[in-house]
């Protein structure tokens, strides 16, 4: 079973964690294990805990990393089939209550998820409207498209996809579903194309790209779980521990930037002679500006074009 995926900003993400040989680390988005493989090569006696809510990714990892999953393995890998928003709860279940030395995130959908036609993530393949990263979840894209109000649909398309024709698309969806339910990705693609003016369809890539992105974000509550997970990650990091986050969309990057700022900057009331301990920053930024892919990586990995890496350290 292969979950082939080319990791973006591989060395930058892991090297900025400054891995320790005996450290305890978390891969919040295990996927194909590209970042994990590189980190494990840096920790001789340490442990990596890999999270993924996609059962297919976990099963693939169990085969591809079988030797490192043995109890006496050094370094050791442990896998968790759950969303990274449940970080602290799962660490406690595994017996890790003293914090971690580092954590990293590679956000968004992986290449294998896009390429699995039946998952319904891609507008390039005809499949049932699904888009669930966790197949045990009830809510899927079919439900959103066929049950939300026109305003709710328009808000999702605009807020999560920056789709400037969100109202027109939402209106067309509601009109079409009156005739019959919208079941497949290609049905939705045709509706989107029909809603967007001809001049706009000729530029800016595939006309359904932004709408599919927005629905995926909504189905998986991606922004809410990201914020919750980052808060927990900062809490469980040991002093000196680091957090690396790769984002691909502006709304993801805004959340990371906002939370890093929240914990690294302090507003001290004027005239206060000292900063109380509970007001002191708990993070320091390792890089003020996001790290982006090198020219070489941009040439070899198209997915890296929109990637931004932010790194912070626990004080």
Curated annotation (Swiss-Prot):
Keywords: Cytoplasm, Methyltransferase, rRNA processing, S-adenosyl-L-methionine, Transferase. GO terms for biological process: rRNA base methylation. Gene3D superfamilies: Putative methyltransferase TM0872, insert domain, Vaccinia Virus protein VP39. Coiled coil: none annotated. Transmembrane segments: none annotated. Its EC number is 2.1.1.199. S-adenosyl-L-methionine binds at residues 33-35, 52, 84, 106, 113. This is Ribosomal RNA small subunit methyltransferase H. The gene is rsmH.
């Amino acid at each position: 079973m292969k979950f082939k995926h080319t990791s973006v900003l591989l060395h930058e993400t892991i090297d900025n964690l400054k891995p320790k040989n005996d450290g305890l680390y978390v891969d919040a988005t295990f996927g194909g294990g590209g970042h994990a493989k590189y980190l494990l090569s840096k920790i001789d006696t340490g442990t990596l805990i890999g999270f993924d809510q996609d059962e297919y990714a976990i099963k693939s990892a169990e085969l591809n990393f079988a030797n490192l999953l043995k109890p006496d393995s050094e370094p050791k890998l442990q896998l968790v089939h759950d969303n990274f928003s449940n970080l602290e709860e799962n660490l406690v279940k595994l017996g890790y209550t003293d914090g971690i030395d580092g954590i990293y995130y590679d956000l968004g959908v992986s290449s294998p998820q896009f390429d699995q036609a039946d998952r319904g993530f891609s507008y390039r393949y005809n499949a049932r409207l699904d888009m669930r990263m966790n197949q045990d979840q009830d809510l899927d894209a079919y439900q959103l498209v066929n049950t939300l109000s026109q305003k709710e649909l328009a808000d999702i398309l605009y807020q999560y996809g920056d789709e400037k024709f969100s109202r027109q698309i939402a209106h067309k969806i509601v009109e079409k579903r009156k005739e019959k339910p919208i079941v497949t990705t290609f049905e939705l693609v045709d509706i989107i194309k029909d809603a967007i003016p001809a001049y706009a369809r000729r530029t800016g890539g595939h006309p359904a790209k932004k709408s599919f992105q927005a629905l995926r974000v909504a189905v998986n509550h991606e922004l809410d779980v990201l914020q919750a997970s980052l808060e927990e990650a900062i809490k469980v990091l040991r002093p000196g521990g680091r957090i690396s986050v790769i984002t691909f969309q502006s709304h993801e990057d805004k959340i990371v930037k906002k939370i890093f700022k929240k914990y690294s900057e302090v507003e001290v009331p004027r005239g206060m002679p000292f900063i109380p301990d509970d007001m002191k920053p708990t993070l320091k930024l390792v890089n003020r500006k996001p790290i982006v892919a090198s020219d070489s990586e941009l040439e070899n990995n198209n997915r890296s074009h929109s990637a931004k890496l932010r790194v912070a350290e626990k004080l």
